[in-house]
Design a protein with these regions (language model features):
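Short glycine/serine-rich loop/turn segments
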Residues: 189-329, 354, 382, 431, ...
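Intrinsic, low-complexity polybasic segments
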Residues: 1-3, 9-28, 33-36, 40, ...
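Residues at flexible loop/coil and secondary-structure boundary positions
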Residues: 32, 48-49, 67
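Structural helix-boundary/capping segments
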Residues: 101, 127, 153, 231, ...
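Serine-dependent amide/ester hydrolase catalytic core
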Residues: 127-131, 418, 437-526, 568, ...
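An N-terminal boundary/leader segment
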Residues: 79, 89-170, 405, 466, ...
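Short helix-loop capping/hinge segments that flank enzyme active sites or metal/cofactor-binding pockets
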Residues: 189-211, 366, 371-381, 428-482, ...
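N-terminal, positively charged, Ser/Thr/Ala/Gly-biased leader segments
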Residues: 127, 137-145, 151-215
Length: 605
């Protein structure tokens, strides 16, 4: 049997030629592939430029088919299409063709809309993409270019990114591709495109923390978590949008992220860009941080999975500070297993951060069996019955029932009263925020937004005696919560008491809404315990419903195990919104962003 190896790369503004290496069958092969692919992917225009070459017309950003195509005398089979065949035409595209076998992965481009073209691979899980990359069925460079194209296509509306670092992302991808080709395996993040909240220093890139006064605060070294992502081979796409100073309010000059499910609804705070990017398929995972709910609330609002680890589990070296004893570094991803891969890469002791714990970092993927026998699942019926709307209560109860079916033993627990902790969180945070901003506040007070300025003023006005009273109450709460984990391994709770609020409702925030938003988040930041947030339903308004599980200090492995077991039997985490194509940019602009000559894009209002 004669063989022809076909390559169809995608670099630059034009497609490279289809160039068989065996000349005798080249004309028939090119004709065969042309017909096959027009039927299989409905490419509108394939332009033959010579007897042995043809190109796509009006090239748009790449669709990664990564197919192995077998052309035999009586049959053509598309054996692999990102792991699955999508139509009969893909399996049996042609009949009675010449005896040629094409075994090289193909990357096809055509002039269909990139949003639709990229939809499938954009929503693969991180671990699925990792497997494709490590088997060399996907190219890190192709994947990164395609993801950059998707960002360019959609993020003009969603505003998930403050800065897209396209050039360095492509350099990361090329390095990963070369290493994988040489047999170097850095682990499951090798070659995978991720993004980070704009509080983590990346050398040579500004760390704005969502603040106009920091627009030119270029970092001179990487944060520890960035260095660890690089060591794991991850491809960093850019910096993600957030509220001013990681507090409550999105502020100019940076655009406010939009909730992909419905932009009339709140995207969460402060790690809004992290959750929006993952939800919209603009990265496979994102670093985030939480001081009072900033991982769990955006994850809840956007229907994605978030892990807030134990305080100190992850180094905060070169991470912009809101409140030192409350700040947690965590992860947003599509699944608990995906998030755990990232957490494992970034966690651990750090000589540059004395507050980073020396507790050993477990292999989170070990023991993801789906069996929860022996796990004691704590349930406080009073918490499930009070302050919740009906949809949230039903979805949370259904999630608990599913965990029970998986083998978890339900244990009745009584959680300590959280009313003090909800309101104590604000002055405790305020004092530490005032300290973090002492070099720029009050000297540049007029450049601060009203929410962050008010928090700092509260901290500056607090007396030492008042602060000590708050710290004692915090210590008592932590002790009472620790006692709960003597009876239960995990406790299941809601996240948002009344579902995702609208933007209009958030613009008229009052004490009742503040309490509802923070009831299930702030107290556990005060305690420093870990939590995982999981989608568990869809409300009548089409917005996601979520629940969370909390555990004792350094119990992330147990939480990941339970979360993975739940997601193995449900599909809520696989639901995704319809992307707002009406707001997409033109294909020419998408190509410029996807091309190798891209430069970083600073998006502002």
């Amino acid at each position: 049997m004669r063989q022809a190896i076909v390559r169809w790369p995608h670099v630059g503004r034009r497609a490279s030629p289809l160039a068989p290496r065996t000349g005798r069958d080249a004309p028939r092969l090119s004709q065969s592939l042309r017909g096959a692919r027009q039927r299989a992917i409905q490419s509108p225009r394939l332009l033959q430029s010579s007897p042995i070459e043809f190109r796509c017309g009006a090239i748009a950003p790449p669709l990664l088919l990564n197919s192995t195509v077998e052309l035999r005398e009586d049959d053509v089979r598309v054996a692999t299409l990102l792991g699955r065949s999508t139509s009969r035409a893909d399996k049996y595209a042609l009949r009675r063709q010449p005896s040629v076998v094409v075994r090289e992965p193909l990357a096809f481009l055509c002039d269909r809309e990139p949003t639709a073209m990229h939809e499938h691979f954009a929503y693969l899980s991180l671990l699925e993409v990792s497997s494709q990359l490590r088997q060399r069925r996907l190219s890190p460079v192709e994947l990164t270019q395609a993801m950059l194209a998707r960002i360019a296509q959609l993020d003009g509306h969603l505003n998930a990114y403050i800065r897209v670092t396209a050039e360095s992302a492509l350099a990361d991808a090329r390095r990963a591709e070369q290493e994988i080709a040489r047999g170097i395996d850095r682990g499951p993040l090798h070659g995978v495109p991720v993004a980070v909240k704009d509080i983590f220093d990346i050398k040579g890139v500004p760390t704005t923390a969502g603040m106009g006064i920091r627009a030119h605060a270029v970092a001179d070294e990487d944060a520890t978590v960035i260095r660890r992502l690089r060591d794991a081979g991850a491809v960093m796409l850019g910096k993600l949008s957030m509220t001013e100073g990681a507090y409550a309010e999105h502020r100019a000059p940076f655009a406010t992220p939009r909730n992909p499910w419905d932009d009339a609804y709140w995207p969460g705070a402060s790690s809004s860009g992290s959750a929006v990017a993952v939800c919209a398929g603009l990265c496979y995972a994102a670093l985030a941080s939480e001081t009072g709910g900033s991982i769990r609330l955006p994850a809840a609002a956007n229907g994605v999975t978030g892990i807030k680890p134990t305080w100190g589990r992850v180094s905060r070296h070169r991470t912009f500070e809101l409140a030192a004893t409350l700040d947690h570094v965590g992860v947003v991803a599509r699944s608990a297993a995906d998030a755990a891969v990232v957490l494992e890469a970034i966690a651990g002791a750090d000589p540059d951060d004395p507050t980073a714990s020396r507790s050993p970092v477990p292999d989170f993927s070990n023991g993801l069996t789906g069996d929860l026998k022996g796990v004691r699942l704590g349930v406080d019926e009073a918490w499930l019955g009070a302050h919740l709307d009906d949809a949230t209560a039903r979805a949370t109860s259904a999630a608990i029932a599913a965990l029970r079916e998986l083998g978890a033993e339900l244990v009745a627990v009584t959680l300590p009263d959280v009313n003090d902790m909800i309101w104590d969180w604000f002055p405790v945070c305020a004092v530490q925020t005032a300290l973090a901003h002492e070099s720029t506040y009050p000297s540049r007070r007029n450049e601060y937004g009203p929410s962050l300025a008010a928090l700092i003023e509260q901290g500056r006005a607090l007396s030492g005696m008042e602060l000590q009273r708050l710290l004692l109450r915090r210590r008592v709460f932590r002790g009472k919560l620790a006692a709960v984990f003597g009876a239960a391994d995990i406790v299941a709770l809601p996240v948002l008491a009344g579902g995702v609020p609208t933007i209009e409702r958030m613009s008229n925030i009052d004490d009742e809404l503040i309490a509802d938003l923070h009831r299930f988040t702030c107290p556990f930041n005060m305690a420093g315990v870990p939590s995982v947030v999981l989608p568990c339903g869809i409300a009548k308004n089409g917005l996601p419903l979520v629940f969370q599980m909390i555990g004792a200090h350094f119990s992330e492995a147990s939480l990941v195990c339970a979360a993975h077991a739940y997601q193995a039997i449900t599909e809520w985490h696989m639901r995704r919104p319809t992307m707002p194509r009406a707001h997409a940019i033109e294909p020419d602009q998408a190509r410029r962003v996807a091309g190798a000559s891209c430069s970083g894009i600073l998006r502002s209002q």
